[in-house]
């Protein structure tokens, strides 16, 4: 870690490769040895690392808080991450939206396969400070200002008083209920129910 701090960005890729290739027993030993220091310093990244080590014993993904930005989002806030950017959701409820893709790579904190060579070849090793996006409010719609044209994301908070029209020619719309219930009506009069359980 001292080398990473001293060399900066040029040390990031070799450090990440070293972490990714650590055997599970070495991950456990390293994190166990760091435990007293973590309790003493109480740094957010170290505390998250300790929590992940307990939840995913032997998984090198537990080191992620040392390599990634810890970002805390309030309800309604969002992040936009470009392709090739590693990320993880540590707690809470989130909705992930991405453009059409069949190349999702896992980096850890999972029982699923981690394709380490492909991951190392694909990840963008760069210093990044993610910007928290806050919605633009227009009536019952909260639109997230996403900096790409591939898709858009907005949250609707129906109040029963204001009808809302969505869609346009050639657009695909997905409605996902996070809480409550709403009844959309199509142009032809067909209705259906969308709620948190649907």
Which residues fall in each region the model found?
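Positively charged, Gly/Ser-enriched RNA/tRNA-binding surfaces
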Residues: 42-47, 53-85
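Glycine- and acidic-residue-biased ligand/ion/polar-headgroup-sensing regions
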Residues: 40-42, 46-50, 54-60, 90-93, ...
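Long, charge-rich alpha-helical interaction segments
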Residues: 1-55
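Conserved short histidine dyad/triad with adjacent acidic residue
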Residues: 139, 152-169, 195-196
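Short, glycine-/Ser/Thr-/acidic-enriched flexible segments
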Residues: 78, 86, 94-95, 102-104, ...
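C-terminal structured domains
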Residues: 141-151
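Short acidic-glycine-tyrosine-enriched beta hairpin
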Residues: 68-80, 85-88, 95, 156, ...
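C-terminal, non-catalytic macromolecule-binding modules
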Residues: 93-143
């Amino acid at each position: 870690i001292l080398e990473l701090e001293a060399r900066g960005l040029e040390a990031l890729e070799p450090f990440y490769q070293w972490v990714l290739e650590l055997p599970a027993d070495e991950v456990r030993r390293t994190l166990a040895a760091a435990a007293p220091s973590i309790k003493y310093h109480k740094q957010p990244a170290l505390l998250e690392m300790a929590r992940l080590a307990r939840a995913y014993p032997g998984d090198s993904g537990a080191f992620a808080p040392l390599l990634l930005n810890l970002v805390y989002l309030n309800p309604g806030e969002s992040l936009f991450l470009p392709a090739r950017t590693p990320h993880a959701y540590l707690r809470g409820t989130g909705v992930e939206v991405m453009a059409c893709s069949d190349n999702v790579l896992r980096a850890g904190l999972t029982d699923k396969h981690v394709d380490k060579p492909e991951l190392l070849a694909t990840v963008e090793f760069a210093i990044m400070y993610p910007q928290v996006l806050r919605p633009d409010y227009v009536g019952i719609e909260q639109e997230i200002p996403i900096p790409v044209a591939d898709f858009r994301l907005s949250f609707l908070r129906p109040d029963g008083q204001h009808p809302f029209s969505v869609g346009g020619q050639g657009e695909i719309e997905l409605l996902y209920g996070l809480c409550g219930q709403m009844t959309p009506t199509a142009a032809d009069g067909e209705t259906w129910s969308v709620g948190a359980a649907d």
